[in-house]
């Protein structure tokens, strides 16, 4: 619903292309970048199988191989908590955005609640774990105030901040985690099975968007 300045979009950390394909279906001219060769190979094949024209490149968010002011929109979803240098990634996002461009993001907060949900339940406890060990590192999670400071420092003004949570009660959520662990749900079905929704609660994950100053 947000009015966008144009239809060129960069998906940073695109992985297998799940979101890149949705953006392409919405009419964006999409470029995806990721450091993982195998993920990009899978993304290219899946896009071709679905007749989607997406430009996939190999690279890292810390050194985006694009000229200044290349994109109307940059998206970085489930990625910021994994990067080696967050400040450099945000600087590169701001550099490649056109003035007035929009940066969409979601990431994980660094709280005791996120440690329970993302580290303990998803990675460490045998009964529920479905992620590989060290897929997430709690110390790399990002408090909202920290991210907003990086955005402001690079001429990006945050417009909205919303939490991401599950509508399910704790027992139903544990059942979903068990289904993922036992292989009854694939990665594309994880989100729907968790029944995620927007919330005011930022304790685990949060999302938002920022706009690059038209004068930058």
Whereabouts are the PLM-identified features?
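A short acidic, Gly/Pro-enriched loop at the edge of an enzyme's catalytic core
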Residues: 62-73
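A short SAM/SAH-binding and catalytic strip from SAM-dependent methyltransferases
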Residues: 73-84
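Conserved class I S-adenosyl-L-methionine
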Residues: 102-127
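Acceptor-substrate binding/catalytic loop of class I
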Residues: 107, 127-146
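Conserved alpha-helix/loop element of class I SAM-dependent methyltransferases that forms part
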Residues: 1-7
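Class I SAM-dependent methyltransferase SAM/SAH-binding core
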Residues: 10, 16-63
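A short glycine-rich, Lys/Arg-flanked "PGG" loop and its adjoining helix->strand segment in the class I
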Residues: 87-99
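A C-terminal cap/extension of S-adenosyl-L-methionine-dependent methyltransferases
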Residues: 50, 149, 153, 158-216
């Amino acid at each position: 619903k947000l009015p966008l300045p144009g239809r060129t979009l960069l998906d940073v950390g695109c992985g297998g292309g799940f979101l890149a394909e949705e953006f392409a279906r919405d009419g964006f001219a999409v470029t995806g970048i990721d450091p993982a060769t195998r993920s990009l190979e899978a993304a290219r094949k899946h896009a071709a199988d679905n007749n989607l024209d997406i430009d996939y490149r190999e690279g890292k968010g810390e050194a985006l191989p694009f000229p200044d002011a290349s994109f109307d929109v940059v998206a970085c979803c489930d990625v910021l908590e994994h990067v080696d240098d967050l400040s450099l990634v945000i600087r590169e996002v701001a550099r490649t955005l056109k003035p007035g461009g929009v940066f969409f993001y979601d990431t994980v907060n660094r709280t005791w609640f996120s440690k329970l949900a993302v580290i303990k339940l998803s990675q460490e406890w045998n009964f529920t774990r479905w992620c590989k060990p060290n897929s997430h590192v709690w110390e790399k999670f990002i408090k909202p105030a920290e991210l907003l400071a990086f955005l402001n420092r690079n001429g990006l003004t945050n417009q909205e901040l919303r939490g991401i949570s599950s509508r399910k009660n704790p027992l139903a959520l544990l059942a979903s985690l068990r289904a993922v662990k036992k292989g009854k749900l694939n990665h594309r079905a994880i989100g729907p099975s968790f029944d995620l929704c927007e919330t005011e609660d930022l304790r685990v994950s949060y999302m938002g968007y920022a706009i690059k100053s038209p004068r930058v």
